[in-house]
């Protein structure tokens, strides 16, 4: 069953207030507002009780949205308008310091998402090129072992694993550092072979 979907998933890009707004109006956080389509998705995600994969459900809901009439979409336009107005009202009631914290936090989260997206793109590019994958670190090996079969409790187990790793002595970490070193050495051998093959192909 699908888990709870964060509001970030439905958020649309929010820019600084328009010039017509009073100069004293602060910048609102990126992603604070959601559009009618996102409101439709949000509502139907909550109503869904199937085991359908999120990507498949999104594809299905996208098709349903396109099939809605203008009058049917008006419902979500109104919901979106009311939601955004309430969010802005709540935001404006905060102190300047609290507003700034929310704006800065939203920017940091956006940067983190962009960083993860770029990292994923690099991994996919490496995979397509046939470049050997960088082996996991000792810490990553430990976390993977601890989270194996974690299921729905993965978040709690992750917290426990992180705390446990931090409390480990060097001797307790040795099993994982030795394995990581072995994998790293093997990686360099395979990488050198791959790079040599790439150079040979380029020279032909």
UniProtKB/Swiss-Prot annotation:
Quaternary structure, per UniProt, is: Self-associates.
Q: Where is the composition biased (Basic and acidic residues)?
A: 102-114
Which gene does this sequence derive from?
Answer: hmg-5
Protein name per its UniProtKB record: HMG box-containing protein 5
Q: Name one GO biological process term.
A: mitochondrial DNA metabolic process
Q: Which residues fall in a compositionally biased region of kind Basic residues?
A: 115-129
Please describe what this protein does. Answer: Binds to mitochondrial DNA (mtDNA) and plays a role in the maintenance of mtDNA levels. May also associate with telomeric DNA, binding to at least two telomeric repeats of the sequence 5'-TTTAGGG-3'.
Q: Looking at the UniProt record for this protein, which Gene Ontology cellular component terms does it annotate, in alphabetical order?
A: chromosome, telomeric region; mitochondrial nucleoid; nucleus
Q: Where is this protein found?
A: Mitochondrion; Mitochondrion matrix, Mitochondrion nucleoid; Nucleus; Chromosome, Telomere
Per UniProt, the keywords (alphabetical) are: Chromosome, DNA-binding, Mitochondrion, Mitochondrion nucleoid, Nucleus, Telomere, Transit peptide
Question: Transit peptide: present as a keyword of the record?
Answer: yes
DNA-binding segment(s): 30-95, 132-195
**Molecular function per GO:** DNA binding; DNA binding, bending; identical protein binding; telomeric DNA binding
Where are the residues of the annotated region Disordered? 102-138
Q: In which tissues is it expressed?
A: Highly expressed in oocytes (at protein level).
Query: Per the record, what phenotype accompanies loss of this gene's function?
Result: RNAi-mediated knockdown results in reduced mitochondrial DNA (mtDNA) copy number.
Which CDD domains does the record match to this protein? HMG-box_SF
**InterPro entries from the UniProt entry:** HMG_box_dom (IPR009071), HMG_box_dom_sf (IPR036910), UBF1 (IPR051762)
- The transit peptide of this chain lies at 1-10
One Pfam family of this chain: HMG_box
Tagged with keyword Mitochondrion: yes
């Amino acid at each position: 069953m699908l888990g709870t979907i964060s509001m970030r998933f439905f958020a649309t890009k929010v820019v600084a207030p328009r010039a017509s707004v009073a100069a004293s109006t602060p910048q609102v956080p990126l992603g604070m507002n959601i559009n009618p389509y996102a409101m439709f998705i949000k509502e139907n995600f909550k109503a869904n009780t199937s085991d359908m994969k999120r990507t498949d459900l999104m594809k299905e809901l996208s098709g349903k949205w396109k099939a809605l009439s203008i009058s049917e979409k008006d419902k979500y336009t109104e919901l979106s308008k009311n939601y955004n107005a309430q969010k802005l009202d709540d935001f404006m009631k905060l102190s300047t310091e609290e507003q700034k914290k929310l704006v800065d936090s939203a920017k940091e989260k956006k940067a983190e998402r962009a960083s993860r997206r770029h990292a994923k793109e690099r991994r996919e590019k490496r995979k397509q090129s046939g470049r050997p994958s960088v082996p996991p670190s000792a810490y990553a090996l430990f976390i993977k072992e601890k989270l194996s079969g974690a299921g729905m409790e993965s978040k709690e187990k992750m917290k426990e694993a992180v705390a446990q790793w931090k409390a480990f002595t060097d001797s307790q970490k040795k099993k994982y550092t030795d394995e990581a070193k072995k994998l790293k050495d093997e990686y360099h051998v395979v990488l050198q072979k791959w790079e040599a093959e790439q150079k040979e192909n380029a020279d032909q």
